[in-house]
Amino acid sequence: MSLQIDAVILAGGMARRMGGDDKGLVELNGKAMIEHTIERIKPQVKEILINANRNQTRYAEFGFTVLSDEHTGFLGPLAGMITAMGHTQADYLLVVPCDCPLLPRDLVARLLAAIETNDAELAVASDGEYQQPVVMLLKPNLRESMKAFLEAGERKIDFWYAKHHCVVESFADQPNAFVNVNTPEQKQRLAAEINQS
C-alpha cells in the first residue's frame, strides 16, 4: 500500500518586511510567487492545501482548497499547520512556505526517507547550514500536540520539534533551494536565480 502525502503551502502571514504585500501573490517572473511553489511540489504530493488569512478568493483561483487559521490573530505558521492537519487524511503532510520558488524536486522523497530510516515523527529540511523551520514532512496525528503547544502561548516551532523525534535532512547539494523573499531586493535576486534554474 502506497503512502498518501498531502501538502500545505503557508501563505497566512502578514509579510511585514515586504511592506505588507501578500507574499504568495507577489509577481515573480510573470507568475505569482505561490505558482512557482505549486509547480515544484505538485508532482510530489497527492493534494495541495493553501493556508491563507487574506485574499482567500484570489488564492482559490489556483484550484486548491484554501484554509484560514482556526486560531485568530495571525499566530504564525503553527496555526496554519494545525488547521491543515485537521483537513487531511494523508499519512504525511508536507509543509512549505509560499515564497520558496526553488524548492527541491526531490523534497518529499528525501524527507520521507529520513523519517523511515530513523523511525522519526517528522523531518525538517536544512540547507546544510541552517534548518528551514517551515519546510518539513510530518504525521498529521501530531496535531493535538502542536495545538496544545500553541494554546499554551508558545510560538517557536523549533521548541515544539524538541518534544518529538525529529530528524534533519540536509539539502546542501541544492544550496539555493530555500532562498525566499522577504524584501524587494531579495525578489530581484531571486528572479535572476529562477531564470537560471
Curated annotation (Swiss-Prot):
Subcellular location: Cytoplasm
One Gene Ontology CC term in the entry: cytoplasm
Cofactor(s) the protein needs: Mg(2+)
Catalytic reaction(s) noted: Mo-molybdopterin + GTP + H(+) = Mo-molybdopterin guanine dinucleotide + diphosphate
GO molecular function, one term: nucleotidyltransferase activity
Protein name: Molybdenum cofactor guanylyltransferase
GO biological process: bis(molybdopterin guanine dinucleotide)molybdenum biosynthetic process
UniProt entry tagged with the keyword S-adenosyl-L-methionine: no
Function: Transfers a GMP moiety from GTP to Mo-molybdopterin (Mo-MPT) cofactor (Moco or molybdenum cofactor) to form Mo-molybdopterin guanine dinucleotide (Mo-MGD) cofactor.
Comment text on domains: The N-terminal domain determines nucleotide recognition and specific binding, while the C-terminal domain determines the specific binding to the target protein.
EC number: 2.7.7.77
Family: Belongs to the MobA family.
Residues given in the record as GTP binding sites: L10, A11, G12, K23, N51, D69, D99
Top-level taxon in the UniProt lineage: Bacteria
Keywords: Cytoplasm, GTP-binding, Magnesium, Metal-binding, Molybdenum cofactor biosynthesis, Nucleotide-binding, Transferase
UniProt keyword Lyase present: no
Subunit structure: Monomer.
